[in-house]
Amino acid sequence: MGAGAVLGFISVFGAGLLAGEELVIRYGVRGPLGRLDQEPHIRMRQGLIRTLRILVPAILAPTLLSAVAVTVVDGADGGLALRCAAILALLAWVTVTLRGTVPINEAALDWDPAAPPGNWRALVDRWENLNFVRAWLAIGAFALLLAGLLS
């Protein structure tokens, strides 16, 4: 197995983990979390933020780096356009995360669950809208990297 195959596997595996994590947060956690009363909702959200702000970058970094590396190593083979599109999707995911959800998450960590800011629901709604975009960017990146590996 050559370097390109190993890097391709790492990128697809990581993208699959990222897409799965985003899919579960968007379509598995979101509904039950939204039905909780204010205090348990905020406590659960804060717990998720504390956990995922470590886990998600640990998945993203090797995924993005290996996607770039396999693109360089394999060059202009049949999967080049697909891998480039996947890298753009991952970079868009990073942009939405850093400019959108991270500032909301940082603010949410300081909320008092018994007395959150008056606009906390609006901030959660904004986060949910951004998360929809993030989830589908991650899913798209996974599909593109997988297709690139198979081409």
Can you name each region flagged by the protein language model?
Residues 1-10, 71-82, 144-151:
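Helix-coil boundary and interhelical linker segments in multi-pass alpha-helical membrane proteins
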Residues 4-20, 85-94:
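Alpha-helical transmembrane segments
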Residues 6-7, 14-62, 109-125:
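Interfacial loop at the N-terminal end of multi-pass membrane proteins
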Residues 27-28, 60-77, 96, 100, ...:
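Membrane-helix exit/interface motif
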Residues 50, 57, 84-87, 125-128, ...:
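Internal alpha-helical transmembrane segments of multi-pass membrane proteins, especially GPCRs
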Residues 57-70, 134-142:
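Core segments of transmembrane alpha-helices
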Residues 79-104, 108:
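Mid-chain, well-packed structural core segment of small domains
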Residues 109-151:
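A generic hydrophobic-segment detector
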